[in-house]
Amino acid sequence: MTTNKSYLTYFTDALWINNQPLIAILGICSALAVTTTVTTALTMGFAVSFVTGCSSFVVSLLRKITPESVRMIAQLIIISLFVILIDQFLKAFFFTISKTLSVFVGLIITNCIVMGRAESMARHVSPIPAFLDGLGSGLGYGWVLVCISIIRELFGFGTILGFRVIPEILYASAAHPDGYENLGLMVLAPSAFFLLGIMIWIVNIIRAPKTKR
């Protein structure tokens, strides 16, 4: 039972307590490009979770036989393998989304979260905790992207997951020039950084001890 709780802690801590984008401020560059819609954010979150979880598992599995002098090269090779797998999977079964994400799936190999979990956690613990930590870190990254993308897609396009949320009748037209208009700022990349900054601020307020408020 204690072991199970310990394993669960690796996962839950990565989701919230040690959330990589909000606490460590890692992996934030992709927030610019992949959060214009919820669909792309979900896909990137899934891809990073897969790569981080699987690569952490393999790095941990091979940690005792990997020479210290080449450990980072070995980690990059392992990460590259899973990046290629998820990239090919998306191209085969979700080609439209893969085309939308373009090179950003391949650039997961440069995501600081993936190498960070391999270097700081996976090579120090057994495979199961390493996998749970990697999976939790990926999902923690994913839910941050989804939160940002919901706001950007809703106010930038009036939709969520491609479904119309803001009725067409409310939009400005020749007959109703004072109607609603989408916020063009939300479609632009800087809006993601503003939203991420607000999320970090909110999380810091929630996490701050009551005595410091």
Curated annotation (Swiss-Prot):
Subcellular compartments: Cell inner membrane
Gene Ontology cellular component annotations, sorted alphabetically: plasma membrane
Domain of life: Bacteria
Record flagged with keyword Aminoacyl-tRNA synthetase: no
Annotated transmembrane regions: 22-42, 43-63, 77-97, 101-121, 131-151, 183-203
Class of enzymatic activity (EC top level): translocase
Enzyme Commission code: 7.2.1.1
Entries under Pfam families matching the protein: Rnf-Nqr (PF02508)
HAMAP family associated with the record: NqrD
Family: Belongs to the NqrDE/RnfAE family.
Functional note: NQR complex catalyzes the reduction of ubiquinone-1 to ubiquinol by two successive reactions, coupled with the transport of Na(+) ions from the cytoplasm to the periplasm. NqrA to NqrE are probably involved in the second step, the conversion of ubisemiquinone to ubiquinol.
Name the record gives this protein: Na(+)-translocating NADH-quinone reductase subunit D
Organism for this UniProt entry: Chlamydia trachomatis serovar L2 (strain ATCC VR-902B / DSM 19102 / 434/Bu)
Species lineage: Bacteria, Pseudomonadati, Chlamydiota, Chlamydiia, Chlamydiales
